[in-house]
Design a protein with these regions (language model features):
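Surface-exposed, beta-sheet-biased, low-hydrophobicity segments with strongly acidic/polar composition
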Residues: 3-297
Length: 297
């Protein structure tokens, strides 16, 4: 009886060690998957650029280069694209409408216009665990949380006191051009259910849906794009916001936010298809008047 008891204890210890080793290996493998995770690109298209003409002048209206989709089959919406050129380490944002945004300094809300000149791409630093970052949609800028349209902290996103919203799942951000039928059934009483959690790679993924937000006499459309910035740092929420209905958006009259775009995108249709090339032209600013190196981003 004594020998049998010892064998049982030994078997239990071996089994416990086996389980511990399996858990350890599984944990290490999961950690490796998380650390080595590579975010998916929003498009698999690749692009190429070439000189539009053999020489340039000092006219500040020169067409500088053409850009085309070199490979890939995605048709890209201008409301989700940003195109800029760099010359002599200076960045020049380009747009269809001739307006762009001024770089915002010392703010947790980074706002810029996309290539269509009407949609705002916004990145919110929601990294603080002790306080919320507020944004006013009329100005597209950071505000105190007392005056916010929305507020952000980590994954927690709340509407403001004067904001209501509905969720649209049957139209994309680009397709949504008017207020849809439905009820504005979301308010500031609870946080937005805007993401899914992928446990396998420990990632926050925005749901494929568009928010229609009504505040005062303006209605907006909004889509969350990412929980991560371009450096893949978490708690930096990226979203697209555009006017949908109502009074004109005050943000477009703010000279500290809106400026004339130094370059124009020409030859564009409603979207950028693989068969279409575009031209980048100077917009009253002499970007290049002699041989120069141009980078496209």
């Amino acid at each position: 009886m004594l020998i049998l008891s010892i064998n049982r204890k030994t078997d239990f210890r071996v089994f416990a060690i086996f389980i511990a080793v399996v858990l350890l290996i599984g944990g290490l493998l999961w950690a490796w998957v998380v650390v080595s995770y590579t975010p998916d690109y929003t498009t698999e298209n690749t692009f190429s650029g070439s000189d539009y003409q053999s020489s340039v002048s000092t006219s500040a209206e020169d067409s500088l280069l053409t850009i085309e989709i070199d490979s890939g089959e995605d048709t890209l919406g201008w409301d989700q694209l940003s195109i800029s050129i760099q010359v002599d380490n200076q960045d020049f944002p380009c747009s269809l409408t001739g307006i762009s945004t001024v770089q915002q300094e010392d703010s947790k809300v980074n706002t810029r216009l996309t290539a269509d000149g009407t949609t705002f791409a916004i990145e919110v630093d929601a990294s603080s665990e002790d306080s919320f970052t507020g944004i006013n949609l009329q100005t597209m800028k950071q505000v105190d949380v007392e005056n916010h349209s929305m507020k952000f902290s980590k994954t927690d996103i709340f509407l403001g006191n004067d904001s209501v919203a509905m969720i649209v799942t049957n139209q994309s951000f680009s397709e949504l051009q008017s207020i849809p039928n439905g009820t504005f059934d979301l308010d500031d009483s609870e946080r937005l259910d805007w993401y899914d959690y992928d446990f396998s790679v420990h990632r926050i993924n925005p749901k494929d849906q568009v928010y229609v937000i009504q505040e005062s006499n303006i209605t907006y459309k909004l889509q969350f794009i990412s929980y991560y910035n371009d450096a893949d740092e978490s708690r930096h929420i990226q979203m697209l916001v555009a006017w949908l209905n109502g009074s004109p958006l005050p943000a477009f009259d703010d000279p500290t936010l809106i400026a004339e775009s130094p370059c124009i995108i020409e030859g564009a249709d409603d979207s950028w298809s693989p068969s279409q090339s575009i031209t980048i032209r100077e917009n009253g600013i002499d970007i290049c008047n002699q041989a120069c190196s141009v980078e496209i981003s």
